[in-house]
């Protein structure tokens, strides 16, 4: 039985009243800004362009500047920046000149977490979905958590919310090692994979050691929740000197799933926990990777005393996260329609998991993928993996690499990827010129019953809504909210 969790008043940050975010529209920044607005702070922020995110923050009282200029930061008591912000940014330069503190976003998140019962979700893949599932289950258990998520939680219509309880659930970002700022009570490690390796000087051992260091930020009475199915997590487990709970499909796991059945968008499975009755669970997401995300959630909810009824309710009622296998609707084609799906996956492991989920849930349907690689460096470092995984589509269209501020790297572009995939002999990918309209290219390739997946972390994210509105797909049916 969960005890009533009274909200703990957030102590004020000394003389800080006005907080300025450089790049406030970013997915990692806007959520923290929204929570701070709800706590009563004055919030301002700048970004290169206005967006629905900045408009939402403006409606809550934030002052938004389009473009980066020195005067934007002139009245701030502190600047919050992400790792994407150049140190030469005029607002940052002005703050440093005026001795205004400049802090990374993770340090501000850590400040919000300092006086709360923090639950931090780390791992190369699955952070956003696991964090979102936790928010849903905690809410179903009556705990009303504060949450900061790297994606839009469909049920809440936002990626952040100030709750009334002492719980704060957030993603822990390893991409720039900033998760070391966090000192949670509970930490999850979903998996550890080679990504963002420039942060770790190309040394995978350094990445592993940093995850261990993150887990040792837990107090001695905290809890590390670790996926035993991931070989790297299993490898570092003996080094973790904190209480641990393991989860996975492995028979050795403390909390494990058996009897997994996938039916389209729904996945059903049985959960086995030590010294407890089996639990029958359903989630509205396809794929074994989402079963693992649900198991991490169940492990924490069980430890926090949330009832089985609330766990089942929170998982079955979960409505998903924006761009995580988000079904937009049906596009009309000759003889029927095509299911249009949008997904954020931008690492070969994530692409493979989604392809496997599609094959499991819709085994008789063709999979047409429009994919945009994210960063030249990632494309270079994981090139062979991309070639192998993307070659498993039935039809593949490749957009040019989304640079994310990087300069092109010879041999790490989408034309070269097309060439390498073609050489495997399984399919003939189509290269999409930068700026080309997608609808006329993709429509002739589609057949009734296909699944059309738009995938990647760049501007490919705008394609699904564009296709829904395209005159070439007049009569497209929008997916109804659950």
Curated annotation (Swiss-Prot):
It is found in: Cytoplasm. Its EC number is 6.3.2.8. InterPro entries: Mur-like_cat_sf (IPR036565), Mur_ligase_C (IPR004101), Mur_ligase_C_dom_sf (IPR036615), Mur_ligase_cen (IPR013221), Mur_ligase_N (IPR000713), MurCDEF_pg_biosynth (IPR050061), UDP-N-AcMur_Ala_ligase_MurC (IPR005758). This is UDP-N-acetylmuramate--L-alanine ligase. It is an enzyme of class 6 (ligase). PANTHER family: UDP-N-ACETYLMURAMATE--L-ALANINE LIGASE (PTHR43445:SF3), UDP-N-ACETYLMURAMATE--L-ALANINE LIGASE-RELATED (PTHR43445). Keywords: ATP-binding, Cell cycle, Cell division, Cell shape, Cell wall biogenesis/degradation, Cytoplasm, Ligase, Nucleotide-binding, Peptidoglycan synthesis. ATP binds at residues 123-129. GO terms for molecular function: ATP binding; UDP-N-acetylmuramate-L-alanine ligase activity. Cell wall formation. It comes from Pseudomonas putida (strain ATCC 47054 / DSM 6125 / CFBP 8728 / NCIMB 11950 / KT2440). The keyword Cell division applies. It holds the Pfam family Mur_ligase. Pathway: Cell wall biogenesis; peptidoglycan biosynthesis. One of its GO terms (biological process) is cell wall organization. GO terms for cellular component: cytoplasm. Its main location: cytoplasm. SUPFAM superfamilies: MurCD N-terminal domain (SSF51984), MurD-like peptide ligases, catalytic domain (SSF53623), MurD-like peptide ligases, peptide-binding domain (SSF53244). The gene is murC. Gene3D superfamilies: Mur ligase, C-terminal domain, Mur-like, catalytic domain, NAD(P)-binding Rossmann-like Domain. Belongs to the MurCDEF family. It catalyses: UDP-N-acetyl-alpha-D-muramate + L-alanine + ATP = UDP-N-acetyl-alpha-D-muramoyl-L-alanine + ADP + phosphate + H(+).
């Amino acid at each position: 039985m969960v005890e009533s969790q009274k909200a703990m008043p957030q102590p004020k940050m000394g003389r800080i009243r006005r907080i300025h975010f450089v790049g406030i529209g970013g997915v990692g920044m806007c959520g923290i800004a929204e929570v701070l607005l709800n706590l009563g702070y004055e919030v301002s922020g700048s970004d290169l362009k206005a967006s629905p995110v900045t408009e939402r923050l403006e409606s809550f009282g934030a002052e938004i500047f389009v473009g980066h200029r020195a005067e934007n930061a002139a009245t701030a008591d502190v600047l919050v920046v992400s790792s994407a912000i150049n140190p030469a940014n005029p607002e940052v330069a002005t703050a440093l000149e005026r001795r205004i503190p400049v802090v990374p976003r993770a340090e501000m998140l850590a400040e919000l977490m300092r006086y709360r019962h923090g639950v931090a979700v780390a791992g190369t893949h699955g952070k956003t979905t696991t964090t979102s599932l936790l928010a849903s289950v905690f809410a179903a258990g009556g705990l009303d958590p504060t949450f900061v998520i790297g994606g839009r939680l469909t049920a809440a219509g936002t990626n952040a919310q100030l709750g009334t309880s002492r719980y704060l659930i957030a993603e822990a970002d390893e991409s720039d090692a900033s998760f070391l700022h966090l000192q949670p009570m509970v930490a999850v490690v979903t998996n550890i994979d080679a990504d963002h390796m420039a942060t770790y000087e190309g040394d995978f051992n350094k990445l592993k050691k940093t995850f261990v260091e993150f887990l040792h930020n837990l107090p001695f009475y905290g809890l590390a929740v670790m996926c035993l199915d991931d070989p790297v997590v299993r490898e570092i487990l003996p080094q973790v000197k904190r209480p641990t709970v393991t989860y996975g499909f492995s028979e050795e796991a403390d909390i494990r799933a058996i009897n997994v059945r996938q039916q389209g968008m729904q996945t059903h499975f049985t959960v086995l926990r030590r010294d407890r009755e089996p639990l029958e669970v359903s989630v509205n997401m396809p794929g074994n990777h989402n079963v693992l995300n649900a198991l991490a959630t169940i492990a924490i909810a069980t430890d926090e005393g949330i009832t089985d009824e609330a766990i089942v309710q929170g998982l079955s009622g979960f409505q998903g996260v924006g761009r995580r296998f988000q079904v937009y609707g049906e596009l009309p084609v000759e003889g029927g329609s095509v299911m249009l799906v949008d997904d954020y996956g931008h690492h070969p492991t994530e692409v493979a998991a989604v392809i496997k989920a599609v094959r499991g849930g819709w085994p008789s349907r063709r999979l047409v993928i429009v994919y945009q690689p994210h960063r030249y460096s990632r494309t270079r470092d994981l090139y062979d993996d991309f070639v192998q995984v993307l070659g498993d589509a039935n039809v593949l269209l490749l957009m040019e690499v989304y640079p994310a501020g990087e300069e092109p790297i010879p041999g790490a572009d989408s034309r070269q990827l097309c060439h390498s995939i073609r050489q495997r002999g399984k399919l003939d990918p189509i290269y999409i010129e930068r700026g080309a309209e997608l609808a006329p290219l993709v429509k002739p390739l589609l057949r009734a019953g296909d699944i059309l997946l738009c995938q990647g972390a760049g501007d490919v994210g705008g394609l699904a809504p564009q296709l829904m509105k395209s005159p070439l797909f007049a009569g497209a049916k929008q997916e109804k909210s659950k």
